Amino acid sequence: MKIICFGDSLTRGVSYVKGRLRIIKDNYPAYLQELFSREEGFNASVINKGVFNDNSDLLLKRLNKDVIEEHPDYAIVAVGGNDCNFLWNEVAENPDKEHQPIVPLERYLENVKTIVTKLQSAGITPVILTLPPLDPVRYYTFISGNSGISISHWIGRMGGIEHWHGLYNRSLNKLIKELGVSKIDVRSALKKTGELIDFISDDGIHLTSKGYKVLSEEIFLFFQQLSDAKETRHI
């Protein structure tokens, strides 16, 4: 079984450590591979195709090269956090103007739909991850440090960072249901497992090693249940 993990920096394994964004070795595809290796009955190869700062526009552009031409059995698609983000330097320069997310919601959903359709046409099973939760207070502190406090009024007027993140996640869930594809609700898994401060790094959006571990375990559980269901059908 060949699995490609396709997404942005959360797939790549970026975390905010000691004041810097770093790629950590404890990323979710690496730990997922470890979990498969420990379990008898699984012969799985997990490939990390995460790229820092990617959004659904960029994923769509590299879909053929990074996924379809690799001929995996499954593609785990994780995207949305950068789509619903804003160009904070522009917001800081013009806090009284209207600003749109980097990838507007309708285009984001259409991109995800296109990715799913192309994967299915290539005989690849798509599995969509929900958006992991963020920590709005720490994220606001992080972007304010980079872009200035002039964005605070704009954020308050537009409903706050968590408003956009939640909106995109709810819309993604609705689309997944409409498409009838598999979903792994990593957002709920992280919220119910423990304190989010342990799972989200100091920039408020990227995960810690512990957070990536929870992500991996939830994904591994999905494949375990999938395997059990196949065995039951063969009895």
Label the predicted regions.
Residues 1-52, 57, 62-71, 75:
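Serine-esterase "nucleophile elbow" of acetyl-processing enzymes
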Residues 31-34, 42, 61-235:
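Alpha-helical cap/lid subdomain in secreted, periplasmic
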